[in-house]
Regions:
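C-terminal engagement/docking regions of AAA+ P-loop ATPases
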Residues: 8-10, 84-175
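Alpha4-beta5-alpha5 switch/output surface of CheY-like receiver
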Residues: 18-20
Length: 175
């Protein structure tokens, strides 16, 4: 085994509860950084990475403007983006919205959904299909519905732990 100087080891996990405690002892990982869920401006920057001006876009609209529209749709707190209600350990209920569970991976998935839909439409019509506000809105809606529907089948305690949230006792979904 050869000796190495000035080596930096970086580890990442979205399941801190699954990391062996021996790895977390003092002197093993000197700096721990928690990266939370992206806020609206951070989401726009993430989407900008996947939705670029070199894609076929709606006339007169640039990719950054589409990214902003997509992010503002996701981060809306209207009934349209209400996933469920959750009961905290203290018994209080509060609304959970799509914005509360969004992640970089989810943002990428939404853009991928829109791209896939555009490719399918291009194949069907034989024409280039531009990435438009309605196309992106449909992708957000698909992600929202899939996330909302999955809430009915989860274990609340495990779900809150996996999603890095305060413990919750119950989840009440819309009928």
């Amino acid at each position: 085994v050869e000796s190495l100087d000035n080596v930096m080891v970086i580890g990442a996990s979205n399941r801190v509860d699954m990391i062996d405690p021996a790895v977390l002892r003092p002197g093993r990982l000197d700096v721990k950084i928690r990266v939370g869920r992206p806020k609206t401006n951070q989401a726009i920057a993430i989407v900008d990475h996947y939705l670029t001006d070199d894609l076929p876009l709606e006339d007169g609209v640039d990719a950054h403007a589409l990214s902003a529209v997509l992010a503002h749709d996701i981060y809306g707190t209207s009934e349209r983006r209400h996933l469920c209600d959750v009961q905290e350990e203290n018994g209080q209920w509060h609304a959970l919205f799509l914005a509360d569970v969004v992640s970089g991976a989810m943002l990428k998935n939404i853009v991928d959904r829109a791209k896939t839909r555009a490719v399918k439409e291009s194949i069907e019509t034989g024409l280039d299909v531009a990435r438009t506000v309605p196309l992106l809105a449909a992708a957000v809606e698909d992600e929202y519905r899939e996330t909302r529907d999955s809430m009915a089948d989860v274990d609340p305690e495990q779900w809150s732990r996996i999603n890095g949230m305060d413990p919750i006792r119950r989840i009440r979904t819309a009928e």
